[in-house]
Amino acid sequence: MALLEFFRPQKKATANIAKERLQIIVAERRNGGPAPSYLPQLKEDILKVISKYVNVSPDMITVSLEQKEEDLSVLELNITLPEDDN
């Protein structure tokens, strides 16, 4: 039994190191570098178009660009629409 306990802490340390490294890699891939300079203007333009049809404020819209692969980016647009008062 003592022999197993001797090796057990090393496995946990190795697993923790691997987990930390993986978290760093995932975080770097999510960020994908700085956001494009056109993103704020795009959000403003989208807000203007949506405001023609629905009463929304700028804080109700989030726009993000995520680099999935080297040649693939995903533009994500989330809009919180107000409840319809019929």
From Swiss-Prot:
Transmembrane segments: none annotated. It comes from the Bacteria. Keywords: Cell cycle, Cell division. Coiled coil: none annotated. The keyword Isomerase does not apply. Gene3D superfamilies: Cell division topological specificity factor MinE. It holds the Pfam family MinE. Belongs to the MinE family. Prevents the cell division inhibition by proteins MinC and MinD at internal division sites while permitting inhibition at polar sites. This ensures cell division at the proper site by restricting the formation of a division septum at the midpoint of the long axis of the cell. This is Cell division topological specificity factor. It comes from Aliivibrio salmonicida (strain LFI1238) (Vibrio salmonicida (strain LFI1238)).
